Protein backbone atom coordinates (compact mmCIF):
# COMPACT_ATOMS: atom_id res chain seq x y z
CA UNK A 1 0.00 0.00 0.00
CA UNK A 2 1.38 3.41 -1.02
CA UNK A 3 1.55 5.84 1.88
CA UNK A 4 1.52 9.60 1.54
CA UNK A 5 4.75 10.11 3.57
CA UNK A 6 6.68 8.36 0.78
CA UNK A 7 5.49 11.01 -1.67
CA UNK A 8 6.40 13.82 0.72
CA UNK A 9 9.95 12.48 1.07
CA UNK A 10 10.56 12.65 -2.66
CA UNK A 11 12.13 16.04 -3.17
CA UNK A 12 13.32 15.63 -6.76
CA UNK A 13 10.19 13.93 -8.13
CA UNK A 14 6.57 14.93 -8.15
CA UNK A 15 3.79 12.55 -7.10
CA UNK A 16 2.82 11.58 -10.65
CA UNK A 17 6.38 10.42 -11.42
CA UNK A 18 6.48 8.34 -8.24
CA UNK A 19 3.11 6.76 -9.03
CA UNK A 20 4.21 6.08 -12.64
CA UNK A 21 7.39 4.37 -11.43
CA UNK A 22 5.55 2.26 -8.88
CA UNK A 23 2.94 1.24 -11.46
CA UNK A 24 5.68 0.20 -13.88
CA UNK A 25 7.47 -1.83 -11.25
CA UNK A 26 4.25 -3.59 -10.28
CA UNK A 27 3.31 -4.32 -13.90
CA UNK A 28 6.69 -5.80 -14.71
CA UNK A 29 6.71 -7.80 -11.46
CA UNK A 30 3.28 -9.25 -12.22
CA UNK A 31 4.20 -10.22 -15.77
CA UNK A 32 7.99 -10.51 -16.05
CA UNK A 33 7.85 -12.40 -19.36
CA UNK A 34 5.68 -9.89 -21.21
CA UNK A 35 8.05 -8.20 -23.64
CA UNK A 36 5.45 -5.55 -24.55
CA UNK A 37 5.60 -4.11 -21.02
CA UNK A 38 9.37 -3.83 -21.25
CA UNK A 39 9.11 -2.26 -24.72
CA UNK A 40 6.60 0.34 -23.53
CA UNK A 41 8.70 1.14 -20.50
CA UNK A 42 11.83 1.38 -22.66
CA UNK A 43 10.15 3.87 -25.00
CA UNK A 44 9.01 5.89 -21.98
CA UNK A 45 12.58 5.92 -20.66
CA UNK A 46 13.78 6.98 -24.11
CA UNK A 47 11.36 9.91 -24.16
CA UNK A 48 12.72 10.94 -20.74
CA UNK A 49 16.31 10.69 -22.08
CA UNK A 50 17.11 7.90 -19.63
CA UNK A 51 19.20 6.02 -22.15
CA UNK A 52 20.84 3.40 -19.88
CA UNK A 53 17.45 2.31 -18.52
CA UNK A 54 15.95 2.27 -22.01
CA UNK A 55 18.82 0.18 -23.36
CA UNK A 56 18.44 -2.26 -20.49
CA UNK A 57 14.74 -2.72 -21.22
CA UNK A 58 15.32 -3.06 -24.98
CA UNK A 59 17.89 -5.76 -24.19
CA UNK A 60 15.28 -7.51 -22.05
CA UNK A 61 12.79 -7.32 -24.95
CA UNK A 62 15.34 -8.94 -27.25
CA UNK A 63 16.11 -11.58 -24.64
CA UNK A 64 12.42 -12.43 -24.19
CA UNK A 65 11.77 -12.56 -27.94
CA UNK A 66 14.99 -14.36 -28.92
CA UNK A 67 16.05 -11.20 -30.79
CA UNK A 68 13.05 -11.41 -33.11
CA UNK A 69 11.45 -8.08 -32.11
CA UNK A 70 13.29 -6.01 -34.68
CA UNK A 71 11.99 -2.60 -33.55
CA UNK A 72 14.02 -3.01 -30.36
CA UNK A 73 17.18 -3.18 -32.49
CA UNK A 74 16.18 0.03 -34.28
CA UNK A 75 15.45 1.83 -31.02
CA UNK A 76 18.80 0.70 -29.60
CA UNK A 77 20.50 2.06 -32.72
CA UNK A 78 18.78 5.42 -32.20
CA UNK A 79 19.96 5.59 -28.60
CA UNK A 80 23.52 4.66 -29.52
CA UNK A 81 23.50 7.27 -32.29
CA UNK A 82 22.29 9.97 -29.87
CA UNK A 83 25.05 8.99 -27.46
CA UNK A 84 27.73 8.99 -30.17
CA UNK A 85 28.40 5.27 -29.83
CA UNK A 86 28.88 4.76 -33.56
CA UNK A 87 30.00 1.12 -33.54
CA UNK A 88 27.10 0.00 -31.35
CA UNK A 89 24.66 2.00 -33.49
CA UNK A 90 25.93 0.31 -36.65
CA UNK A 91 25.72 -3.13 -35.02
CA UNK A 92 22.14 -2.53 -33.90
CA UNK A 93 21.21 -1.26 -37.36
CA UNK A 94 22.71 -4.36 -38.96
CA UNK A 95 20.72 -6.57 -36.59
CA UNK A 96 17.58 -4.62 -37.42
CA UNK A 97 18.12 -4.85 -41.16
CA UNK A 98 18.85 -8.58 -41.03
CA UNK A 99 15.67 -9.26 -39.02
CA UNK A 100 13.25 -6.82 -40.66
CA UNK A 101 11.20 -7.49 -43.71
CA UNK A 102 11.57 -5.06 -46.57
CA UNK A 103 13.35 -1.76 -46.87
CA UNK A 104 12.79 0.70 -44.03
CA UNK A 105 13.37 4.37 -44.96
CA UNK A 106 13.85 5.40 -41.31
CA UNK A 107 16.59 2.78 -40.86
CA UNK A 108 18.26 3.93 -44.07
CA UNK A 109 18.14 7.54 -42.89
CA UNK A 110 19.56 6.59 -39.50
CA UNK A 111 22.33 4.63 -41.21
CA UNK A 112 23.35 7.68 -43.23
CA UNK A 113 23.17 9.89 -40.13
CA UNK A 114 25.39 7.48 -38.17
CA UNK A 115 27.89 7.36 -41.03
CA UNK A 116 27.91 11.16 -41.29
CA UNK A 117 28.17 11.61 -37.52
CA UNK A 118 31.04 9.14 -37.18
CA UNK A 119 32.93 10.78 -40.03
CA UNK A 120 32.40 14.24 -38.52
CA UNK A 121 33.55 13.02 -35.11
CA UNK A 122 36.72 11.59 -36.64
CA UNK A 123 37.28 14.81 -38.59
CA UNK A 124 36.86 16.88 -35.41
CA UNK A 125 39.46 14.76 -33.61
CA UNK A 126 41.93 15.14 -36.48
CA UNK A 127 41.33 18.89 -36.64
CA UNK A 128 41.88 19.20 -32.88
CA UNK A 129 45.19 17.31 -33.11
CA UNK A 130 46.23 19.64 -35.96
CA UNK A 131 45.07 22.65 -33.89
CA UNK A 132 42.60 23.72 -36.57
CA UNK A 133 40.14 25.01 -34.01
CA UNK A 134 37.44 26.39 -36.29
CA UNK A 135 37.40 23.21 -38.39
CA UNK A 136 37.24 21.16 -35.19
CA UNK A 137 34.34 23.24 -33.90
CA UNK A 138 32.42 22.88 -37.18
CA UNK A 139 33.01 19.13 -37.43
CA UNK A 140 32.04 18.59 -33.79
CA UNK A 141 28.86 20.59 -34.42
CA UNK A 142 28.04 18.31 -37.35
CA UNK A 143 28.64 15.24 -35.17
CA UNK A 144 26.45 16.71 -32.43
CA UNK A 145 23.59 17.12 -34.90
CA UNK A 146 23.39 13.31 -34.73
CA UNK A 147 24.90 12.59 -31.31
CA UNK A 148 23.13 15.30 -29.35
CA UNK A 149 23.70 13.52 -26.01
CA UNK A 150 27.40 12.77 -26.46
CA UNK A 151 29.37 14.28 -23.60
CA UNK A 152 32.68 13.40 -25.29
CA UNK A 153 31.86 15.29 -28.51
CA UNK A 154 30.39 18.21 -26.60
CA UNK A 155 33.55 18.47 -24.47
CA UNK A 156 35.65 18.34 -27.61
CA UNK A 157 33.63 21.14 -29.19
CA UNK A 158 33.94 23.20 -25.99
CA UNK A 159 37.73 22.81 -26.01
CA UNK A 160 37.93 23.75 -29.70
CA UNK A 161 35.59 26.69 -29.16
CA UNK A 162 37.73 28.00 -26.31
CA UNK A 163 40.87 27.66 -28.41
CA UNK A 164 39.14 29.40 -31.34
CA UNK A 165 38.00 32.23 -29.07
CA UNK A 166 34.29 31.40 -29.20
CA UNK A 167 33.64 31.75 -25.48
CA UNK A 168 29.86 31.79 -25.84
CA UNK A 169 29.77 28.39 -27.56
CA UNK A 170 32.21 26.93 -25.04
CA UNK A 171 30.17 28.15 -22.07
CA UNK A 172 27.01 26.71 -23.61
CA UNK A 173 28.64 23.32 -24.07
CA UNK A 174 30.23 23.32 -20.63
CA UNK A 175 26.90 24.28 -19.08
CA UNK A 176 25.40 21.19 -20.72
CA UNK A 177 28.33 18.95 -19.77
CA UNK A 178 28.58 19.95 -16.11
CA UNK A 179 25.24 18.51 -14.89
CA UNK A 180 26.13 15.19 -16.50
CA UNK A 181 29.29 14.79 -14.46
CA UNK A 182 28.92 12.84 -11.23
CA UNK A 183 31.25 14.99 -9.17
CA UNK A 184 32.57 18.50 -9.12
CA UNK A 185 36.12 17.10 -9.20
CA UNK A 186 35.46 15.38 -12.52
CA UNK A 187 34.15 18.64 -13.96
CA UNK A 188 37.18 20.57 -12.74
CA UNK A 189 39.53 18.04 -14.33
CA UNK A 190 38.07 18.73 -17.79
Describe the function of each predicted region:
Residues 1-190:
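Alpha-helical tetratricopeptide repeat
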Amino acid sequence: MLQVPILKQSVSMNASVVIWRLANILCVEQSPTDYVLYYKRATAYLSLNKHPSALQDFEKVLELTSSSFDKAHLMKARIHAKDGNWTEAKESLESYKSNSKGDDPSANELTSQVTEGAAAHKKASKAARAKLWTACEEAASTALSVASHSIEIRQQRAECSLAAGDIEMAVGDLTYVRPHHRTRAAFLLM
